[in-house]
Amino acid sequence: MCGIVGYIGQNDTKEILLTGLEKLEYRGYDSAGIATLNDNGVHVTKVKGRIATLREDVDTTIDSTMGIGHTRWATHGVPSVMNAHPHQSTSERFTIVHNGVIENYNDIKNEYLADVSFISETDTEVIVQLIEKLHEKYQDTKKAFSEAMSLLKGSYAIGLIDAEDSETLYVSKNKSPLLVGLGDGFNLVASDAMATLRETDQYLEIFDKEIVLVSRNYVEVQTLDGQVVERKPFTAEIDASDTEKGTYPHFMLKEIDEQPIVMRKIIQEYQNDNGQLKLDQDIRTAMKDADRIYIIAAGTSYHAGLVGKEFIEKLANIPVEVHVASEFSYNMPLLSEKPLFVFISQSGETADSRAVLVKIKELGHPALTLTNVPGSTLSREANYTMHLHAGPEIAVASTKAYTAQIAVLAILAVDTARVKGLELDFEPLQELAIVANAMEVLTDQKEELEQLARDYFGTTRNAFFIGRSTDYHVAQEAALKLKEISYIQAEGFAGGELKHGTIALIEEGTPVIALTTQENVNYSIRGNVQEVVARGANAMVVSMKGLEQDEDAFVIPHVHELLTPLASVIPMQLLAYYAALHRDCDVDKPRNLAKSVTVE
């Protein structure tokens, strides 16, 4: 959940590192630091706080053409300058940055480093001290680095500088994302291609347990035992301008507004020249052959999976289970004879999901990944991949990836139904085009939604979202958005569950937002609204055109009943955005969170 960047070349290292870290700040922002190497040695600058603070502290007079940087989300040790990366060995010859969690760091300390004094609370310092200890034994940095990597258990993406070798960055990874960016007379290392898009669009994948020697003019990939690995580079499908806010005050608002564009992009990508659905034949076969689908996801992706379950069961007549990734390995259900696992992850790097993928691959079961990042770990390791085509999502709170996931799941469900020969009165591409138009109408109603956010969330500490059927899943996502960025305690409930306990929490002025977009439950959810109003709640009803009543606070345009989450979630996202804005919260980088959860 941290971000690392490295550079070796001819240009000003400091600016490249700082700019790269700014692009990676969504991965963590508890603390940050850089280390640069020149003829006078290694220069380390670390701060508690964000990259802007680091910029202020960096000595701009120090010239260097080689360095590493890190932005941290704390796992071992509190956020502090002492625990911030880069970390150095006792002699200061070796300097390291690390993303991940070393599970056996205490064992290594006891077995190899009993005589070493540590200055931080991190597992990362153990790695760099181990490398120094092994270098004393071998007098060879690559050998020491390789053996150290072989001793580590857990997840890591590592960049190392040897103060006595200005020609090589030493790099390795296991279960954590890391790429090498390729340039002319320079090369880079980064957790995410977004960090280095201004320098290059050519990248080399690094696989687990590989050692990479990065020089100015070459990159050599080796196995842990020194065998050279040949690998072709790939071109990143991201434009650098897509990672900028432009005229928007926040990435989140920009990404909310981009959702109509994303819907049209998905239509384009999943439509053939005849206007029919276009999917990989292997995916079609896998879906048709499956007797049960197991959706594995976390957070917002899990909420999208709940909507996807309804699509697949209603349209394709295949039973579906949706599981929280972090719990699945502990409580694996009895699997069907022909299961297909569907992993949903914006980043394609979610550690909990990857752990499940590794487990089910060992069992020989097929896997399909829905991800926004081509070439990501889940995409690479699953049997099949469907891309979301949402473009880079920078804000920590997911918006456009959520709606992209739902749209792609709808396409997958309809295509599977047709492959199975089932009759459907539902054309997803045409209906998604209608959704895109509805989204544009909704994103133009910001002033109205901003006022509603002031009225309902201005001073509250708690809020409840209720819905029935599909609206219940949107209520869960709406609550997550509000709590993520405004720090209001919010929960999403099934309307029918209110009387089974939750209604005890309703008191005078408690905001309750009720969603009603399904005709068959409209009467019931309005009954729930009356129940909470009778107990003092400040109720807001958000309804769909055709189901509205005069007292409703907000009405969304009519869309197909299967796709209502794509429309009803837009006002929920904007309510959360304005609630956070008016409470002076950091919308794009909420406290204690990171966008890409790459540790379990």
Swiss-Prot record:
Keywords: Aminotransferase, Cytoplasm, Glutamine amidotransferase, Repeat, Transferase. The keyword Metal-binding does not apply. Residues 283-422, 452-590 form the SIS domain. Gene3D superfamilies: Glucose-6-phosphate isomerase like protein, domain 1, Glutamine Phosphoribosylpyrophosphate, subunit 1, domain 1. The keyword Transferase applies. Catalyzes the first step in hexosamine metabolism, converting fructose-6P into glucosamine-6P using glutamine as a nitrogen source. This is Glutamine--fructose-6-phosphate aminotransferase [isomerizing]. It comes from Oceanobacillus iheyensis (strain DSM 14371 / CIP 107618 / JCM 11309 / KCTC 3954 / HTE831).
